[in-house]
């Protein structure tokens, strides 16, 4: 879980910097009647952008207003100091952890149209791909979980046309909680409380589309079904005390018709 832990600690650090926890992880999948479909994982930090831009503007203003800067070069025209890595890449490599998946799953049987999502302007990162059947989807996710998050996951989804199941594995929300707990040792309760406070509104949303079927029933207590019955949504908040008490999770058994 080393890579995953580093990823989530980077998220927390950015949350502290931006004074906001507007982080949304979105897992979206479409399952057609023949078992084929598409999968997309997105890390959406777009709501942080305004705050980060404001801080950058304040820093730029301070630089312009500084007099007698010892680093200035007189008589040599305009001088641009070397770019600060944090300014050059404010995400600290966070986007690479989410989006550099294409090389890992290209060539996997049953997987096609692999696309990296790396929108540094709007703080959106992730990946998407098409699959021929649920077995191909599970193969790809097994590779992604092993290579990128150092977790062993054999099977995440089951689908046979009449039923759908999302197993209680590969849960990024639960893994985030574990990563934060492992980072906090004895005597660091205050740090954990701060983490929970800043990440209380973080969401991990699963959206499942069934264009050829309608959802009859779901055993996940917080799942919601659209009026047309073709989409099921589970909106988790891993650091919400209310959801923690109710033991909310990603697992869902769904009956289709």
Residue ranges and their predicted role:
Residues 9, 33, 37-39, 53, ...:
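Residues in flexible loops and secondary-structure boundaries
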Residues 1-9:
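Bacterial N-terminal signal peptides that target proteins for export
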């Amino acid at each position: 879980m080393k890579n995953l832990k580093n990823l989530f600690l980077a998220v927390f650090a950015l949350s502290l910097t931006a004074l906001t926890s507007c982080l949304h992880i979105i897992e979206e999948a479409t399952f057609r009647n023949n078992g084929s479909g598409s999968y997309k994982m997105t890390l959406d930090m777009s709501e942080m952008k305004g705050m980060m831009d404001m801080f950058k503007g304040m820093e730029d203003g301070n630089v312009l207003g500084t007099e007698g800067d010892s680093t200035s070069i007189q008589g040599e025209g305009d001088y641009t100091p070397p770019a600060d890595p944090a300014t050059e890449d404010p995400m600290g490599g966070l986007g690479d952890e989410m989006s550099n998946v294409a090389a890992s799953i290209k060539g996997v049987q049953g997987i096609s149209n692999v696309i990296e999502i790396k929108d540094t302007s709007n703080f959106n990162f992730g990946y998407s791909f098409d699959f021929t059947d649920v077995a191909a989807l599970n193969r790809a996710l097994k590779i992604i979980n092993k290579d990128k998050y150092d977790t062993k996951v054999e099977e995440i989804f089951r689908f046979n046309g009449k039923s759908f199941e999302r197993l209680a594995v590969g849960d990024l929300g639960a893994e985030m909680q574990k990563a934060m707990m492992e980072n906090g040792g004895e005597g660091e309760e205050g740090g954990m409380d701060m983490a929970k406070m800043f990440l209380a509104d973080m969401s991990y949303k699963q959206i499942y589309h069934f264009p050829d079927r309608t959802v009859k029933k779901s055993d996940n207590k917080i799942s919601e079904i659209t009026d047309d019955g073709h989409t099921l949504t589970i909106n988790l908040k891993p650091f919400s005390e209310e959801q923690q008490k109710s033991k909310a999770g990603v697992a869902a058994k769904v009956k289709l018709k």
